[in-house]
Amino acid sequence: MATKFPSFSQGLAQDPTTRRIWYGIATAHDFESHDGMTEEQLYQKLFSTHFGHLAIIGLWVAGNLFHIAWQGNFEQWVLDPLHTRPIAHAIWDPHFGQGLTDALTQAGATSPVNIAYSGLYHWWYTIGMRTNEQLFQGAIFINILVCWLLFAGWLHLQPKYRPSLAWFKNAESQLNHHLAVLFGFSSIAWTGHLIHVAIPESRGIHVGWENWLTVMPHPEGLTPFFSGNWGAYAQNPDSIDAVFGTSQGAGTAIFTFLGGLHPQSESLWLTDIAHHHLAIGVVFIIAGHMYRTNFGIGHSLKEIIEAHNTSHPKDPHRGYFGIKHNGLFETVNNSLHFQLGLALASLGVACSLVAQHMGALPSYAFIARDYTTQSALYTHHQYIAMFLMVGAFSHGAIFFVRDYDPELNKDNVLARILSTKEALISHLSWVTMLLGFHTLGIYVHNDVVVAFGTPEKQILIEPVFAQFAQAASGKMMYGFNALLANASSSASIAANSMPGNHYWMDMINRPDALTNFLPIGPADFLVHHAIALGLHTTALILIKGALDARGTKLIPDKKDLGFAFPCDGPGRGGTCDSSSWDATYLAMFWALNTIAWITFYWHWKHLAIWMGNTAQFNESGTYLMGWFRDYLWLNSSQLINGYNPFGVNALSPWAWMFLFGHLIWATGFMFLISWRGYWQELIETLVWAHQRTPIANLVGWRDKPVALSIVQARLVGLTHFTVGNFVTFGAFVIASTSGKFG
């Protein structure tokens, strides 16, 4: 007899309804809930999935390399990066008529192609790649790596090669390995690639497999390193007249501290980037030798954490603050959800920083002038950051439900956070209301006075504190005599005393979008507070969901109901919308709105600067109708014209995505508004009709069709809302930017 899906749960496998399928899919990756799962098996399975995950990433990277090498125009783009549109891949579609075929035959191609807005061309060019052959070689190498990773994943599931539970819980060895080997060595290795391959290529010197052992990165070789004369590596940097990819203006330095941008490529100096990776690598390798493992030297994490308490005889607070950190080492080390929450939060912050820095400190040659790519990458990384951050709180809540031990954490900082949750949640609630009422109040006031023809009556507040922070970093335009904006300050004197040329002040005072601190005014002040409202409300919902995960006054035994439950059951009034999963679900809507506001702001401000029309954002951004009319509507018009009575144009695929994204988004509401009763009745009506229709009733089914649970229907609704949201906005960003700048 064939085993029914899911094999990991006999209870579900015997369910006679379609619940078996949907619950099976929903819990396929919840290894903890599977039949017969031990803690050791759980760790081993997760460890093997890491190799599979890396293999999928590798296939994706190899696919990009292969398709661009095969169908792209990398070699043509390299010859003129500023005026050649990069091709992502060809499009073959039998439905295309001649009009669309002609419209999408672009960028010098002879058949329909997609334009690349990924920044991959800029990245590969910057790191020294110049030919399709090199891209093919990269794809082949990564595919070999993928095969090795898949084998490693399989191998570590075999009894002989499964790591033990003690190995997984050896925190010090794990830290040393991740810090020194994964982060440290990989940073040093990347430094090696930059100085051996990328920097020479940027100076017109080709380094390949045939000569990389004979072309020295620096004329003096390793002599300065071993003699301690490290400064030699910073002498003779590229001049400000340097032309990227040629010997014109090229120097010999490999590690510099120039600051600012290479004037011609308008990206960070490659020698600065190499210096950064070298320093990061050294720091991580030192950090990777800090923790006590084989030789009994170094720090014990448990000792460090437990020293963070107020039992020290010289501590003035001794005996007042409790035992603070006792029990935290075991709590974190024994909870995968706690560890995952920390990792997701860290990666979420890093990803949001990447979004900001790709615009403010562009590291790839000529990418700053590819406005559509810059817009797409900012949006892409902020959306990813949002998902990671929401996931961090979700797994924090699961930790409180599944892994938290009240006895182990008695009276420590974790227990105290739980015991003061009412104060934390109510203060966050107060902050969100203050932000919301004041920000919306000012926006609406401004809308009203503008509508009545008296724009001079708007409430316009200059962001003086932010302007002061910019001035302290060197921005002169505001007239603050602070730190780097004051030539006689100690900061300026120290900066000017550094030997050699430095270009930070040139960059921060540029008049265009390549200044790393854009000029800000009242429109920025308002949208900043609107975004702060969104962030605080998202945080409020998520923090409340996590801190209330174990129980509340309304449902004191909530931890026994699990992370995701629809209502608290009969006999108690059936309180709904109260599980930690519901908090995640509700927070996602706020998170999506907030990310939309963040990306709206970044995109509109940059569009205005790129088009030389900064007044549009500065004047229209102070009231809501300005945002709706001069950003959303004005930039949607090109999308809506992708198809028109005169035929189609190259924006038509984005126009189609824009419309279809709205449809997906709206479909979400069907699941969010209609609950189980409606769907169950609809299903039973369809079943009744099917069973009474000749020919159709020859086809039957084993599982009795039942409606999705409330939690599942919400997930389906949220998924449609989310996918529709970013399909719509992704198409909007790409089409509205590329429609203006190509």
UniProtKB/Swiss-Prot annotation:
EC number, as in UniProt: 1.97.1.12
Gene Ontology biological process terms from the UniProt entry: photosynthesis
Chain sites annotated for binding divinyl chlorophyll a B1: 662
Cellular component annotations (GO), alphabetically ordered: photosystem I; plasma membrane-derived thylakoid membrane
Membrane topology recorded in Swiss-Prot or TrEMBL: Multi-pass membrane protein
Record keywords: 4Fe-4S, Chlorophyll, Chromophore, Electron transport, Iron, Iron-sulfur, Magnesium, Membrane, Metal-binding, Oxidoreductase, Photosynthesis, Photosystem I, Thylakoid, Transmembrane, Transmembrane helix, Transport
Principal subcellular localisation of the protein: membrane
Membrane is among the record's keywords: yes
Role, per record: PsaA and PsaB bind P700, the primary electron donor of photosystem I (PSI), as well as the electron acceptors A0, A1 and FX. PSI is a plastocyanin/cytochrome c6-ferredoxin oxidoreductase, converting photonic excitation into a charge separation, which transfers an electron from the donor P700 chlorophyll pair to the spectroscopically characterized acceptors A0, A1, FX, FA and FB in turn. Oxidized P700 is reduced on the lumenal side of the thylakoid membrane by plastocyanin or cytochrome c6.
Subunit structure, as described in the record: The PsaA/B heterodimer binds the P700 divinyl chlorophyll special pair and subsequent electron acceptors. PSI consists of a core antenna complex that captures photons, and an electron transfer chain that converts photonic excitation into a charge separation. The cyanobacterial PSI reaction center is composed of one copy each of PsaA,B,C,D,E,F,I,J,K,L,M and X, and forms trimeric complexes.
UniProt-recorded name of the protein: Photosystem I P700 chlorophyll a apoprotein A2
Origin species: Prochlorococcus marinus (strain NATL2A)
